[in-house]
Amino acid sequence: MATETTNPAAAAANARNSAVVRFAGDSGDGMQLAGTQLTDTSAILGNDVATLPDYPAEIRAPAGTVAGVSGFQVNFAAEQIFTPGDVVNALIAMNPAAFKAHIADVEPGGIVVVNETEFSKTNLKKAGFEPGYNPIEDEKYEQQFKLYKVPITKLNQEALKDSGMSPKDVNRCKNMFALGIVYWIFDRPLDTTIRHLTETFAVRKNRPEVADANIAALKAGYFFGETAEIFPVRYSVAKAPIPKGLYRKVTGNEALAMGLITASKLAKKSLHYCTYPITPASDILHYLAPAKNFGVKTFQAEDEIAAMCAAIGVGFAGQLGVTGTSGPGLALKGEALGLAVMTELPVVVVNVQRGGPSTGLPTKTEQSDLWQAMYGRNGDCPAVVIAPQSPGDCFNAAIEACRIALTRMMPVVLLTDGYIANGSEPWRVPKESDFEPIEITHADYEPTGEKDDPGFAPYTRNENLTRPWAIPGNPGTEHRIGGLEKANGSGAVSYDPTNHQTMTRIRAEKVARVANMVPDIQVTGDEDAKLLVLGWGGPYGSILTAVNNIREQGKKVACTHLRYMNPMPSNLREVLAKFDQVLIPELNNGQLRLILRGKYLCDARGLNKIQGKPFLIEEIEQAIELLLSGEWGDAEALYPVDGNVDVNAQALEV
């Protein structure tokens, strides 16, 4: 079977620099698997890839409704990319609801493959179309897009009619038929997916008939693209110039889990992951639970508070305690996180942000927990906060969070978001020698036996204000522990007003001195630019790409990205002072902007997107253009609407 373009001239003529493909269908149609396989295949071919999974919030919305549509977007390219793409080049819509939910994102002239079988009157009604109207029969869509009507469900049934599978199981294979069509259109080989299907179903699940059926459907879709002659053009995307090394595809949650394991080895501590399931952080538990051979212990607690307290207990016992959650869970953990601050015990809290408040948008991304991570506890209760910028960066950020927690005896909040947690990218596998060991010394005390022996002082401090880490059971280091205020030095319970003020200042200064572990922030772009675009967390790729695009037009702009949110880099004040204007794009209502205004008197402008979606590159470009041209006006912040940043479309519609 030929799976590559055999005509070199044709391949060159149809070469693309990148392609953005989106699969969309019911949550049971296997769109996540199809997208994941296209990602894996493209990565193995040597493309750079970036993905954007999109899950419905409902466990199982009514079939055929817009609320139940599941999507997976893949951007594969012949150059380095940082986002899953602004516009869709090819949409595969498995039913009318998927078509309705995603057609607006397809570029003019883009490819739209629809599963014609499912565009029945019943399904059109479920999707909310007017009676008697079928969008794939509307000339405007045929004029606007390359619209291909393929009866995928019917063709899949015909391909598997002799498989011996039940009609229900046959229907589950139609995602592979659709994937086969995409593989033909974009000149992708089948072997990676065939190997995956064989290993998953024939080997691990001992269901070879399921593997055979899916492989047959995949090949049938591919051969349909090759023989039906309805697709006049075939495309190819060359390899990307990626530095040599061993690569694997990782999601943010997967990279974070591996980073936690690596940190435990660097510290020579066992990793105890204590958690309560919550979207979108649950995958971290799924990745760590099978890792017992790495000394990992997982504990699924009865609630968020118990999980947090268990992780603190692990730190008290002398090991690496980590807990994971999302926004609502972080709120529940708040009191116990304050206990970790008061007791000065090491613990890492992973918060995968999602749309809020309350239950909010459980499966959608947001950056709205920054204030909660920094200030969301009673009393003056500081904690270190780190925010990785990409799926692969979650690995390094996890190691740094553990390093700070273990060596400085304090809680650290690792603030990711749903976009980078579920998104994926090629990740260059590092060597163990790339990382410094996490050096830890435990407290030891030999009683003198004298009457005036002061005993072990658990709250004495070194130059970083770090207190000794005493492991229970070590003779001579017995001490009080708990949430009541401690006497400076001895750790005895104290209600003295002056002592409380001293200890409050010590706890704040202890976090501030972590700045000596934080590298200076680096600026990318024009040194003489007047405008700085400053971001944090997941929007990194969109910001960098937008700034590069603007600079290619000959306009001067610079950008930088915060990874350490508290304490911030020591040179940040100096960097901010160099620019006349600062733009802060963030997926919230301006939380970082307000922090920087209060801390550095920085009169920044905000680009605030609170839609459960990551930034489009174009949205940031438009905001930059408005500031450079002086058309921004007096607004402190602008909000994108339907992909556009318009100063005249900012009125709040009630």
For each feature predicted by the language model, list its residue ranges.
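Gly-rich Lys/Arg/Thr-decorated short loops/hinges at beta-loop-alpha junctions or inter-strand turns
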Residues: S18, E158-L160, F201-A202, I230-G245, ...
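Short glycine-rich or small-residue beta-strand-to-loop segments that form or flank ligand, phosphate
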Residues: A19-D26, A178-G180, L271-C274, G321-G324, ...
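Thiamine diphosphate
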Residues: S18-P108, M258, A263, L271, ...
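Active-site cofactor/cluster-binding pocket
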Residues: A2-L256, I261-A267
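Flexible, low-complexity linker and terminal segments
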Residues: I242, V250-G259, A267, A397, ...
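Short gly/pro/ser/thr-enriched loop/turn and capping motifs at secondary-structure boundaries
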Residues: P56-R60, F119-T122, I305-M308, G329-L332, ...
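Conserved thiamine diphosphate
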Residues: G85, L91, K140-L155, K364-V413, ...
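Flexible, glycine/charged-enriched surface loops at secondary-structure junctions
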Residues: T3-T5, V49-L52, T192-I194, K205-I215, ...
